[in-house]
Amino acid sequence: MKLGFIGTGKITSSVVTGICRSKISFKKILLSSRNRNVAKKLKRKFRKVFIAKNNQEIVNSCNWIFLAVTPKVGKKIISELKFRPNQKVISFIATINLAQLKKAIGKKVKIVRAIPLPPISIRKGPVPICPPDQQVKNFFNKLGTTVEIKNEKLSNNFWSVSGMMAPFYELLNTVSNWLVKRGVKRDDAQKYITSLFVALSEDAVVNSRKDLKYLVKDSQTPKGLNEQGVKELRKARFYISLEKTLNSILKRLNKV
């Protein structure tokens, strides 16, 4: 199988890194040269990675085509490419839906939308796909955990939550900086904070079969530090603000 990536940003770099370090069987990966620095770095790093002369060469040469460009670029270039029937197109573009992709491609190809995140480089994290596709499911299960979505409208909810990645890192950064301001060395602060949140996340995964509200309750003791923390953040409308932000992102996606 030959895999082609149109667009060479952070997500392409993460996905390609994950693929090359996984047990996925493939002949080669062909990259566009849109971001030549990223493309060259991946080519130097992995022997099966090559750089294409142009996007059409990728479409001509590969069985699976991954679209990893911005919506603005996608709307401009996809309709200019000449796809072949029976190719598989996996789109990472958040604001171009299936109907728009089908119209732009104009050929009978299998189209799947996917939402990979940077931790895919270490073969961690969820990868929602829509519509369900067994081959694509098996592929991403080797890079993380595939989540199949039948209703495309529902997929926008997952796209919205993917917008919480930078806010999460900003939370880690804020708490880490708080420790640094109080005399803790930055390396120690970051090691403690990242280790703490990894442990909390893993605990949540283990207990994910029950409602997460019980973890909120179980992590508090009467008049304890965690009770104070969650009460004050609720009073400051922190979680309401979080939900409003998710609603705002979803509203943007639903306009497509």
Can you say where each PLM-predicted feature lies in the sequence?
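NAD(P)-dependent Rossmann-like dehydrogenase/reductase catalytic/cofactor-binding core
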Residues: T194, V198-V256
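Aromatic pocket-lining residues of Rossmann-like dinucleotide-binding sites
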Residues: I19, K23
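Rossmann-like NAD(P)(H) cofactor-binding subdomain of soluble oxidoreductases
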Residues: V15-V16, L30, R36-V38, L42-I129, ...
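Short acidic capping loops at alpha-helix termini that bridge into adjacent secondary structure
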Residues: F26-K28, N86, D187
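Internal alpha-helical scaffold of NAD(P)-dependent oxidoreductase catalytic cores
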Residues: Q100-K110, G125-F158, G163-N207, S248-V256
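Catalytic nucleophile loop
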Residues: T12
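Extreme N-terminal starter segment of soluble prokaryotic enzymes
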Residues: M1-G4
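Glycine-rich Rossmann-fold phosphate-binding loop(s) that bind the pyrophosphate
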Residues: T8-G9
